[in-house]
Amino acid sequence: MRVHSLFLKDFRNYSELRLELGPEMNSIFGLNAQGKTNILEALYILSLGRSFRTSRLTEAIRFGSSHFFIEAVFSQNQVFHTLSIQVDKRGKKILFDGAPITKLSALVGLFPVILFSVKDTTIIEGSPAERRRFLDLLLAQASEKYTGQIALYHKALDQRNAAIKTQDYKTIAAWNSPLIAYGSLVALLRYECAKKLHKIFQNLWDNTLKETLSLRYESSLITTESPTLNDIASNYYEQLRLANTKDFELGYTTVGPHRDELIITLNDLPVSKFSSEGQKHSLLAVLRFAECVYLQEEFLIHPLLCMDDIHACLDQNRLDQLFQLSTSLGQTVTTSTICPNHLDSNSSIFHVTQAQVSLVTSNFL
């Protein structure tokens, strides 16, 4: 994917902005609170229909305005598309090439964006649910079918849990089959994704910090290195049977992919407990790079890589190494308080001050 232009209207501190992006590295610099991160937030909202900074999109409406409007012109496989979103107090309106999108599940994957943010450490420090969500979002960007599978699994899980609470044995039995069918596929797809990410992650990490890194998907349903869907389904059936008494005691389903974990270790130690802040930020940055490589290699998808406030959390040595990696990933947008001096001739540099964006240098625009 190549993003050609971004238009903002009454979004955050921008009354109006039209930004033409270069095809490779786009570096945006300026003092704090000038509007740098707002540009990345707008791109992220177009990708997923939600913000990484607030749970309420109406908070992004510029003070005194009734709504905000974001639009991007981009191309995939040399075909141009337009994607826009308008948000007001009544809700949001999303258009793709002029046609309305009414479900966010249909939006995911149309405009793939991978975001690295200094504040986004929940994948490393957060609960297992955060890491499961990380895998689910990556798989959803690659395939709309996965979004449907995970939704069907959670529907079956919710129905089974409701039946457990009322001790409705007949309904529990009825939901076991769809729970096993959808859950087994979710577990297999996550496992395969994590396995491929591990190899990519190791290669990228070895090229930067020369430390031993491991990423693996841990599931009670998967007991072999190369599981089949039937293997997982058989294990799930047996584990549900054995967990019946425990499920009734606790009031919910205790086995399944909703209990699985993505384990990340550095030098055989959990990164959440034994890594420095610098290591965590470097690891997270490389993990985002690995997502891009995974989408490119497995699905021929070239997402936009966005990196926010990079000088705040990465030292110059790590920055140089990561920027060297980014040259092979396609289009990238970064923000920083420091004017970049490490970029090559294929870069576009923008300066932001009080919501005014000016082009400093570019060989493309």
UniProtKB/Swiss-Prot annotation:
This protein's major location comes to cytoplasm
What's the domain of life for this entry? Bacteria
**InterPro entries (alphabetical):** DNA-binding_RecF, DNA-binding_RecF_CS, P-loop_NTPase, RecF/RecN/SMC_N, RecF_2
Q: Transmembrane as a keyword?
A: no
GO BP terms in the entry: DNA replication; DNA synthesis involved in DNA repair; double-strand break repair; SOS response
Question: So where does ATP get bound?
Answer: 30-37
One GO location term (cellular component): cytoplasm
Any GO molecular function: ATP binding
> Which keywords accompany this UniProt record?
ATP-binding, Cytoplasm, DNA damage, DNA repair, DNA replication, DNA-binding, Nucleotide-binding, SOS response
Q: Which Pfam families match?
A: SMC_N (PF02463)
Tell me the compartments it is located in: Cytoplasm
Instruction: Report the function annotation for this chain.
Output: The RecF protein is involved in DNA metabolism; it is required for DNA replication and normal SOS inducibility. RecF binds preferentially to single-stranded, linear DNA. It also seems to bind ATP.
Q: Which PANTHER family match?
A: DNA REPLICATION AND REPAIR PROTEIN RECF
The Swiss-Prot or TrEMBL record describes its family as follows: Belongs to the RecF family.
Q: What is this protein called?
A: DNA replication and repair protein RecF
Q: What is the lineage of its organism?
A: Bacteria, Pseudomonadati, Chlamydiota, Chlamydiia, Chlamydiales
Q: Which gene encodes it?
A: recF
